[in-house]
């Protein structure tokens, strides 16, 4: 379980006299439960990636608290990270290594014994339908193949919590469907707590047990798709989202996320 309480983060844009402070995240709160998929839904620049980077201990919040299975991310970052699988940017693969070697390398980083890591690679290959990829070098992989390898790396230490930042970006229809089915299995068969950010309505409707709508750096609504639609009285979920996020069509103010450091999640762990 991941709990986020009153999370805030500012960034300074520009230099000298042109410098200004932009509030990227402003009091975001939500709880992501075990055995459920929680979608962080918002327009570009809403603060989704910044929020997930703070959850993954890649950014320090200015205010607020994050706990992962009861562990305070600020006070116990290494212990919390050990209980998270973060889907790093697929460009972070080591292209001279095979998919298997990439996954096993991350197993060693997480301290997974070799006798445990080997069978886990095989099990993940079956679950993600990537067995033909295992012994190929990742250079030249398609976006979907890279995504599967990155997801396997994120899961190799069997974390109870999984974080994905817009995981279907750049994927074709078949790769998107494959990823969606994998996430369902992780939820239904293994009881994982899964958080993913997106701005795609269909992903939310098909996957999410809970939706957290973020706009202008704030949590503006949360609940199931049915509950959010009932709240607005609108049958179409896209219209529901527009009503909740923009008040029926108001333009969002510029956010730091689209102009500064919080690029897609990436780094030295997954």
Regions found by a protein language model. Give the residues of each.
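Conserved ABC transporter NBD signature motif
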Residues: 64-75, 79-80
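Helical segment within the ABC ATPase nucleotide-binding domain
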Residues: 177-190
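Catalytic Walker B motif of ABC-type/P-loop ATPase nucleotide-binding domains
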Residues: 162-166
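ABC ATPase "signature
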Residues: 222-223
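Conserved ABC ATPase "signature" region
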Residues: 104, 108, 115-133
């Amino acid at each position: 379980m991941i709990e986020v309480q009153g999370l805030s983060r500012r960034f300074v844009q520009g230099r000298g006299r042109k410098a200004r402070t932009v509030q990227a995240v402003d009091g975001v709160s939500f709880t992501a439960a075990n055995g459920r998929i929680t979608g962080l839904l918002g327009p570009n620049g809403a603060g989704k990636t910044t929020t997930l980077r703070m959850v993954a201990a890649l950014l320090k919040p200015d205010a607020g608290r994050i706990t992962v299975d009861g562990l305070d991310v600020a006070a116990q970052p290494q212990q919390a990270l050990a209980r998270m699988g973060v889907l790093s940017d697929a460009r972070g693969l080591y292209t001279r290594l095979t998919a298997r070697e990439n996954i096993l390398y991350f197993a060693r980083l997480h301290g997974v014994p070799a006798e445990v890591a080997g069978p886990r690679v095989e099990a993940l290959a079956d679950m993600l339908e990537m067995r033909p990829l295992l012994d190929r070098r990742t250079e030249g992989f398609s976006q979907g193949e890279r995504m599967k390898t990155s997801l396997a790396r994120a899961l190799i230490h069997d974390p109870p919590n999984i974080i994905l930042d817009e995981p279907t970006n750049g994927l074709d229809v078949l790769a998107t469907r494959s990823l969606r089915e994998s996430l369902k299995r992780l939820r239904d068969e293994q009881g994982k707590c899964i958080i993913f950010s997106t701005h795609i309505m269909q992903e939310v409707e098909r996957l999410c047990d809970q939706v957290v709508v973020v706009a202008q750096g704030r949590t503006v609504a949360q609940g199931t798709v049915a509950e959010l639609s009932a709240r607005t009285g609108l049958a179409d979920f896209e219209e529901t989202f527009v009503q909740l996020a923009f008040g029926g069509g108001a333009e969002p103010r510029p956010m730091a996320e689209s102009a500064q450091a919080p690029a897609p999640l990436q780094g030295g762990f997954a």
